[in-house]
Amino acid sequence: MTQLSTKILWLFVATLGAICFGYLALQNGESVSAIYLVVAAVCIYMIGYRFYGRFVAYKVLELDKNRATPALVENDGRDFVPTNKAVLFGHHFAAIAGAGPLVGPILAAQMGYLPSMLWILVGGVLAGAVHDFVVLFISTRRKGRSLGEMIKDEMGKFTGGVAMVAIFGIMLIIIAILAMVVVKALAESPWGLFTIAMTIPIAIFMGIYMRFIRPGRVGEASIIGFVLLILAIHYGSVIAADPYWAKIFTLEAPTLAIVMMAYGFIASVLPVWFLLAPRDYLSTFLKIGVIVVMAVAIVLVAPDLQMPKANTQYFDGTGPVFAGGVFPFLFITIACGAISGFHALISSGTTPKMLENETHALAVGYGSMLAESAVAIMALICACILHPGLYFAINSSSALIGTDVVNVAQTISSWGFSITPEEITTLTANIGEHTILSRTGGAPTFAIGVALILHELFGGVDLMAFWYHFAILFEALFILTAVDAGTRACRFMVQDILGNVYKPLGDIHNYPAGLLATALSVAGWGYFLYQGAIDPKGGIYTLWPLFGVSNQMLAGMALLLATTILVKMGKARYTWVTLVPAVCVLVATLYGGIQKIMPYEEGNKVANAVSHVAAVSIQSQKIKDLEFKLNNTKDEKEISTIKKEISIATQNKVGNLLNAILCVFFMIATLLVIISCIGICLGKIKIPLKETKYIKIDEFQKI
């Protein structure tokens, strides 16, 4: 292709994207086809990767194809393993793409499609992808060191020490939440559990095939693995229909929680080429395959975006799906769909230890985040093609809308979104569920959206239930890969912390030390997971509200670290690349964090619903009222009921108090990183650059 034709092609892509983007932003009144959103997103991602991604890669970071990576220098066949670019892309994408891009945009859709679309597209290209890419780069230049360890090396021991503890706490919360989503999806689901279980032996076979049987034959292993995965999905439905096998593969949530912990431990201590990398690569086939099929199906089916462009009546935070104003909580709620701190832990965890060539970081780091942003766009479409009345029926709590279909329809219609009981019951029957009312959390909405789109092309109404349950399975597989990779990254983090106490424990090549660190990691997130599995109001459910804020604070810290390193590298003129998104993320997140620790304010329902401190006051008063009531009744049945209510209120009080304390601690850690960044950038704090010595790649031969 000639230079002129290339320029014409990119001009066409840019023009097409701008037209579709502008149409979505400016259209008023009439419904808009989802095709415009798909086309706008694809064009923006193409432009972002080709121009901005390459600018960051070769102007800002100056990637060097001749520089040896830690995977080559430290190759130990377990954690440090040079990995094919396509396989590593699959591993990294599977590891970072958890519940966030599926759930966040669906919840944020209550504000309308335009605010979410703007942040997912702009934030994904200019903030999230840059964040992932730059952290992967700086970790690769530092022997694959973890985020906390790099903050300690580059920004000071005290700041780094506090940050390491905060990052570890955030990591435990994130992994436990991801694991709980998987447990909820697979509990009582023999089809899903069988299919997920089968990906393990398939991945092990692929790992052995690519390393010993046919070294380097990634294409062959990919075809075999993909065929076996499709067979596993098919026979999962056969297993579910068989009474004997269905019973074997039907597990309750507490049992599944234990299985998840065992799997997380084993996957984290085995050599990365044996299970983790091939399984993530295999999962990526399904993940990207479903997203591509969804995009094509949307173009063919052309569903309308029925959600209004902007639900301005909920911008003040009074929306029924989540409390909090459009600023800052839209950004915090969307989270991973635009930028995620969890990605920094993977980009400084497993991935830099597997990067075969430094130039691969562009595709692996920047490209993977754009792929995740595309997932977020698909999730947003799944929510917005629903009738708004159905959307709110699914995502509003039963305490707000009730449980009777007629009353639910009346309540939601009174909000201005007309819906009939028949529309609710018809959809419920079509997807084979008992009810769709108050199926909060985002996952059911995504599955319904997938079913509504795909049944138009494959099978009609008769197969809507199949596509719905397939989407639930897809979500479980989508999220599980983030759990095993997250646990491995958490192990590196624990070893960094233990290494400050006893140096041999910090050696990641030390197998016994790795086993101890993995056990501590799994015990940490596993405790919260198991408690949540046996008590729907305990364990990780207590810490769930902290996910969004803590995750975004982590992203802000990572971007400030990157800014500091750019200054030390003599690239201060390029610091806007990381500093601008850091400021945007931290202003929104710290403002949200402050709102979460504000005291109770009489008559301010939105502020009180957001604040953990206000919730503590509300629950304390509730406990006092219940205790007074308890002391003035003699009815045994009523006494039992009141005691139960006191127990629940006490649990809520303790949970919110813990959230408030952790929120303050995370903000303090973030402020320390901000202060250190400012001090270093202004030359007030002198800490030398800790980049590893340059070693030419031709000194090593891939093992």
Regions found by a protein language model. Name each.
Residues G53-V81, L107, M117, L121, ...:
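Flexible loop linkers connecting adjacent transmembrane helices
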